[in-house]
């Protein structure tokens, strides 16, 4: 097991001889690096005295230049993206069009007279942050806690890890940005309950619902818009200034708009030469954008089951705008937590977490975490992760599974450990079978599976089927016979293969869905031929052939598109009772139900 430490407060000493780890907020617009000592956080400034370092990178005179607002911007948006995704997403393509190597089979950028992958370029920003901190602290830094958006998938997280490793960091942990912000508030203010984290950054908007209890932070829902941020507010103000005062749509006008926005966070009016704008006008201009964020936040609450919220935590410099606080209070009628600088809340949490992970102390409260994910094998060899890597323990998680084929009288359970997407690439812990189930149609049987880890790291897995009142349980020690080196290798392999694993999983899921659809429809045709004409059967068979060809081609996008085409054309082309039957099958019903 790995240990998280929560230390008792002492006098901070940022330069004392001890093990050091930093927290890094690698942002879309700006990045920060900080260190904590005895729960007091210091954000490290750059050589030109900036705490907020623009996440930009340029290459001139055979050197990388970081933070001068020139060159490649918003590289964070590219983490985990494929070349195909970039080409098919105009907003992303516009970021890299001047650098993109369209002849490559994978995403590479022509940068620094080389063809570089995204992690290799991002690593230079990590190196810059590392060098600035080492210069300030007069010591070598090798350990870091790095924050990532809650919605980042395995591929994106893997590329962040790789970039940091190239820069010379041992990544102690990746933590979600909303969790980091909540962590800062939770430690400093002993907060607990359910909180909405409203993160309006320069280029993205993220909202998360977190449950905070006794030092444990759980993200229970996320939502957002990765094309909405403080920069959009700047654009709206710029357009107003251009139209109102006949100014050119230029960088200078954009900078003027930013200055006006910042001034109006604490003054009622802004005047500069022949340009003026007051707080009321600003609020009228940006209200539609703010309302969009509120709607997204309300959707996130609905996804979480509409829990009672104890407060809203503000993250991101744009949240300094008074209108945002006012509208949030109107919408939710709860406390708005903003007394930590919203630009620094995330890096504060990362720095505090970094200190807890590396600073041994006699007066520490230890919280164990699961060092590797635990899950089980599903049909097709796919892994369903049930207890995730670095989840605090003890913990218990319940999930429901069902049978895949008709008349199945037993369910085999294969318990696995690891971060990979396919069972063959994970560590097998145990197998058992739930026998004596009543023979029923696929999908009728419901088996409730419980994964529990106690304070000693012992995993208990139990399965219970209600109809037959059948149950089975096993105990296993997941970490028996596995040392830290092997754990590190498994984690490294998971990150290294994240893209391949993710694509493999998508393909397997698409194949399973396609095969199930083909089986159901062909059985329906065989049993209900009297309800359809030959022409209708011909249309159905032709569409099924398209799906079969896609499966044979092993292309998950093609498979999904052919399934969508099937569903769409069935509705349009076949207007009989057979259409109703097929639609019911597509919703998961079986023929006996329909008859």
From Swiss-Prot:
The UniProt keyword set, sorted, is: ATP-binding, Chaperone, Nucleotide-binding, Stress response
Q: Which GO terms describe its molecular function?
A: ATP binding; ATP hydrolysis activity; ATP-dependent protein folding chaperone; unfolded protein binding
Q: Name one GO biological process term.
A: iron-sulfur cluster assembly
> Membrane-spanning residues where?
none
InterPro entries in alphabetical order: ATPase_NBD (IPR043129), Heat_shock_70_CS (IPR018181), HSP70_C_sf (IPR029048), HSP70_peptide-bd_sf (IPR029047), Hsp_70_fam (IPR013126), ISC_FeS_clus_asmbl_HscA (IPR010236)
HAMAP family according to UniProt: HscA
Instruction: Name the job this protein performs.
Output: Chaperone involved in the maturation of iron-sulfur cluster-containing proteins. Has a low intrinsic ATPase activity which is markedly stimulated by HscB.
Family statement: Belongs to the heat shock protein 70 family.
- Identify this protein by name: Chaperone protein HscA homolog
Query: What is the phylogenetic placement of the source species in the record?
Result: Bacteria, Pseudomonadati, Pseudomonadota, Alphaproteobacteria, Rickettsiales
């Amino acid at each position: 097991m790995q240990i998280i430490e929560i230390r008792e407060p002492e006098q901070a000493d940022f330069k004392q001889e001890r093990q050091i780890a930093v927290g890094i907020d690698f942002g879309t617009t700006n990045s920060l690096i900080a260190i904590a000592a005895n729960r007091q956080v210091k954000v490290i400034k750059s050589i030109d005295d900036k705490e907020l370092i623009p996440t930009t990178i340029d290459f001139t005179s055979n050197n990388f230049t970081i933070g001068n607002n020139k060159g490649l911007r918003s590289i964070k948006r590219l983490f985990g993206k494929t070349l195909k995704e970039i080409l098919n997403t105009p907003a992303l393509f516009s970021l890299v069009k001047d650098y993109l190597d369209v002849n490559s089979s994978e995403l590479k950028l022509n940068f620094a007279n080389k063809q570089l992958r995204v992690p290799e370029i991002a690593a230079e920003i990590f190196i810059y942050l590392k060098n600035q901190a080492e210069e300030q602290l007069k010591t070598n830094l090798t350990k870091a806690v790095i924050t990532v958006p809650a919605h980042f998938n395995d591929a994106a997280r893997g590329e962040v890890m790789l970039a940091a490793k190239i820069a010379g960091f041992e990544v102690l942990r990746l933590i979600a940005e909303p969790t980091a912000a909540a962590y800062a508030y939770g430690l400093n203010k002993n907060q607990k309950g359910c909180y909405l984290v409203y993160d309006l950054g320069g280029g993205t908007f993220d909202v998360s619902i977190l449950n905070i209890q006794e030092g444990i932070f759980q993200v229970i829902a996320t939502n957002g818009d990765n094309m909405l941020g403080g920069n959009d507010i700047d654009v709206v103000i710029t357009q107003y200034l251009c139209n109102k005062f006949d100014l050119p749509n230029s960088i200078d006008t954009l900078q003027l708009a930013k200055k006006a926005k910042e001034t109006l966070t604490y003054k009622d009016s802004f005047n500069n030469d022949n340009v003026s704008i007051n707080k009321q006008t600003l609020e009228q201009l940006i209200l539609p954008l703010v309302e969009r964020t509120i709607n997204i936040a309300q959707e996130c609450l609905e996804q979480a089951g509409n829990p009672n919220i104890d407060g809203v935590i503000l993250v991101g410099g744009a949240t300094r705008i008074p209108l945002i606080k006012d509208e949030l209070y109107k919408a939710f009628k709860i406390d708005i937590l903003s007394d930590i600088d919203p630009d620094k809340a995330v890096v504060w949490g990362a720095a505090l977490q970094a200190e807890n992970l590396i600073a041994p102390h006699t007066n520490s409260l230890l919280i164990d975490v699961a060092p590797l994910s635990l899950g089980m094998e599903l049909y097709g060899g796919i892994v369903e992760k049930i207890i995730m890597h670095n989840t605090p323990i003890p913990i218990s998680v319940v999930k429901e599974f069902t049978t895949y084929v008709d008349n199945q009288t037993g369910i085999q359970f294969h318990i696995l450990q690891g971060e990979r997407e396919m069972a063959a690439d994970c560590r097998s812990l145990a197998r058992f079978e739930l026998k004596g189930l009543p023979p029923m149609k696929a999908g009728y049987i419901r088996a409730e599976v419980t994964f529990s880890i106690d304070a000693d790291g012992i995993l208990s897995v139990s399965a219970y089927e209600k109809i037959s009142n059948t149950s089975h349980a096993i105990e296993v020690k997941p970490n028996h016979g596995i040392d830290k080196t092997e754990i590190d290798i498994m984690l490294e392999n998971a990150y290294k293969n994240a893209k391949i694993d993710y694509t493999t999983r998508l393909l397997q899921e698409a194949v399973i869905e396609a095969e199930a659809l083909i089986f159901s429809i062909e059985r329906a045709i065989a049993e209900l031929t009297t309800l359809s004409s030959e022409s209708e059967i011909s249309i159905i068979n032709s569409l099924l052939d398209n799906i079969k060809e896609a499966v044979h081609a092993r292309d998950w996008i093609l498979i999904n598109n052919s399934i969508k085409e099937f569903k769409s054309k069935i509705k349009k082309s076949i207007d009989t009772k057979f259409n109703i039957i097929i639609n019911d099958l597509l919703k998961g019903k079986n023929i006996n139900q329909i008859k």
